[in-house]
Amino acid sequence: MKKTILLLVSVAAMALAADVMAETRDEIAKIGQNVGAEGKFSYWTEGSVPLAKLKNFVERVTNPQSDGFVPQSDRVAVFDLDGTLVCETAPSYFEWMMYLHRVYDDPTFHATKEQIATADTIKKAVYARSVPGDMMWTEAIAQNEVFAGMTDEQYREYAIEFMETPVEGMTNLQWGEAIYLPMAEVVGYLAANGFTTY
């Protein structure tokens, strides 16, 4: 009897999960904006220690009467992308997958044989889930080569366009939707409190 109930619960959970969609980029942006300067967090446990520490920090640096006050022009928050804001294992780092997209799938880019060989090596390591230590350096140099000549704005536009491509191996998920929603709230909260975020 217990096995039957467990099986039914499992099947019901899978049926419900099959219909779940990721938030769109517009919805994610609204999640960040909805927090506001006062910190109305929906994806954090109210009263949790990390949330309390974050709110206390922001109160301290934004209150002109506080010893810890930081002028708005000096408020900066820098985030690591992979593993902090987006999933880093779908199947690998965002920028690595964008690099592979550029080499293999971008009709406006004509990769050299050497660039394709490097991409093949990186792709093999990514899908084997065995990235050697020196691969980070190899990939960084390769990134620089395939995006050389782009202005900052062109690179930004390219990344935004890449965000609209599906995540390989996932259903109904684009790269720009693979955002941790609690972190979207943190970014929005800091921005609403005068932080420049990177």
Identify the residue ranges that each predicted region occupies.
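Gram-negative bacterial Sec-dependent N-terminal signal peptides
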Residues: 2-21
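Alpha-helical substrate-recognition element adjacent to the catalytic core
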Residues: 23-77, 81-198
